Each structure stands twice: as structure tokens, then as C-alpha cells.
Amino acid sequence: MSTPFYVSPQQAMADRAEYARKGIARGRSLVVLQFADGIVFVGENPSRALHKFSEIYDRIGFAAAGKYNEYENLRIGGVRYADLRGYTYDRDDVTARGLANVYAQTLGTIFSSAAEKPYEVELVVAEVGETPEGDQIYRLPHDGSIVDEHGSVAVGGNAEQISTYLDQRHQDGMTLAEALKLAVQSLSRDTNGSEREIPAERLEVAVLDRTRPQQRKFKRIVGRELSRLLEAAGASTAGEAGSAEDEGSDDEK
């Protein structure tokens, strides 16, 4: 009788983590940034039917990178949890922190179970507050851990490089156009450092806007509105460059 092949628990968990990370890395990256009036979600997504970003509840948004069918199941479960809790208790009792805890338990259970493969997903759960200080952003990797993020966060294939780029350039109090411009610039950078152009029709953009009078703060930005914001960001860049040139000319005089 042959001896069963033995794999240490540490090696088994390391293999599962590597499997999940490789699956997530095959997906396109996305970024979530705070700006003066809320939180913006930006990602490259050529599909108009399959969304990376979704509304979960009044002030809560959801973003995901990885396998679509897996994070879509999680999204649907999150919507059901939020609806049931809001109906049973109060709408204010539905929070991003509570939802992140539910997702963490689900992902952690699946990751540690030898009976099924780990989910190849990385999630972001965000809640817009009454003020920027009240905004909450949580990142949930494949293993179910929870990371409390501030300012900006990137997930997906090139997340580490994009996060470094954002950390160096993101500022508090940015306008939506400025935040959108920074997000697109970060997503346009390839792994070798070169830049490429992402057309507006390949961008998926959504916001949690605290200034909206409606109870539901989630809104998708598409079509002409997205084009206007991108043009405004480009115009502000050109204006800054022109001002810098004028200052240089004055100095030479």
C-alpha cells in the first residue's frame, strides 16, 4: 500500500493564496478615490453589460476585480443582506463596516476550506459620509482579511504599481474632474512604466455623491457627462501648463 502524499498546512495555504492571486492578476485593475464631494470608482471595462461597480445600499458602493461570476454572487448576497437588515432594523443600521464583516466571513471560510477552491476576487466596499472625514473604504483580499483604506485604493492585476502612483499624487479636497484624471492616468500606466490611452468608451465610472439630494447616493457617469469631465480635466491640465510657462517667461525677463 502506497503512503499518502503529505502537504503541510502552511504549504497548502500558500498554494491556495498563490492560486487566488494569479486569478485576480489576470483581471483589469480598478481604483477607488476620495474627492471633495464623495468617492469615485474608475476602471477599464470594455463591456457595457457586466459591471465592476454596483450600488449595495443608500450610501454604500461595491467594486470588485477577478472572476465575474464569483464576485457577482457576492454582490447579490450583499444586496440581500443590506435589504434585510434595513427592513428589519433601520436604514442607518446598514453600514460598509457591517457589510465588509459579512464578506470577510464568507471569503475566509471559502479560502480555508479544502473542499472547494478559493475565490479569485478582491473586493472594495465604500460608504460615503456626511463629510469627507466620515467616508469609509474597505479592501477585502481573497483570504477574507479586511484592510481599512484612506484616500485611494487599487485592486486587480497591476494594483501595486497603481497604488504607489496614487499615493504619491492623491490629495484631499480634489474635484471630481481632478480625481477622475488622476485615476485614468494611474490606470493608463503599463507594468513597464509606459503610458497608453484609454478611450472614454472603455471606462466604467461611478460615484457616491454626498451632495445628491436623493437618499441613494450612487450614480453612474456615462456618455456626454463622462466626456465633459474628461475634457475639463484636460483643460485644467493645459491651463496649469500655460501658467507655468508664463511664470517662466516672467522670470527670464
UniProtKB/Swiss-Prot annotation:
Cellular component annotations (GO), alphabetically ordered: cytoplasm; proteasome core complex, alpha-subunit complex
Activity regulation info: The formation of the proteasomal ATPase ARC-20S proteasome complex, likely via the docking of the C-termini of ARC into the intersubunit pockets in the alpha-rings, may trigger opening of the gate for substrate entry. Interconversion between the open-gate and close-gate conformations leads to a dynamic regulation of the 20S proteasome proteolysis activity.
A Gene Ontology biological process term: proteasomal protein catabolic process
Biased segments, Low complexity type: 232-242
Pathway: Protein degradation; proteasomal Pup-dependent pathway
Region (Disordered) residue spans: 232-253
Disulfide bonds, paired cysteine numbers: none
Keyword match Iron: no
Biased composition (Acidic residues): 243-253
Keywords for the protein's UniProt record, in alphabetical order: Cytoplasm, Proteasome
UniProt-listed CDD domains: proteasome_protease_HslV
GO molecular-function terms, A-Z: threonine-type endopeptidase activity
Cellular localization per UniProt: Cytoplasm
Subunit structure and binding partners: The 20S proteasome core is composed of 14 alpha and 14 beta subunits that assemble into four stacked heptameric rings, resulting in a barrel-shaped structure. The two inner rings, each composed of seven catalytic beta subunits, are sandwiched by two outer rings, each composed of seven alpha subunits. The catalytic chamber with the active sites is on the inside of the barrel. Has a gated structure, the ends of the cylinder being occluded by the N-termini of the alpha-subunits. Is capped by the proteasome-associated ATPase, ARC.
Family note: Belongs to the peptidase T1A family.
Role played: Component of the proteasome core, a large protease complex with broad specificity involved in protein degradation.
The protein's name in its UniProt record: Proteasome subunit alpha
The species this protein was found in: Streptomyces avermitilis (strain ATCC 31267 / DSM 46492 / JCM 5070 / NBRC 14893 / NCIMB 12804 / NRRL 8165 / MA-4680)
Originating gene: prcA
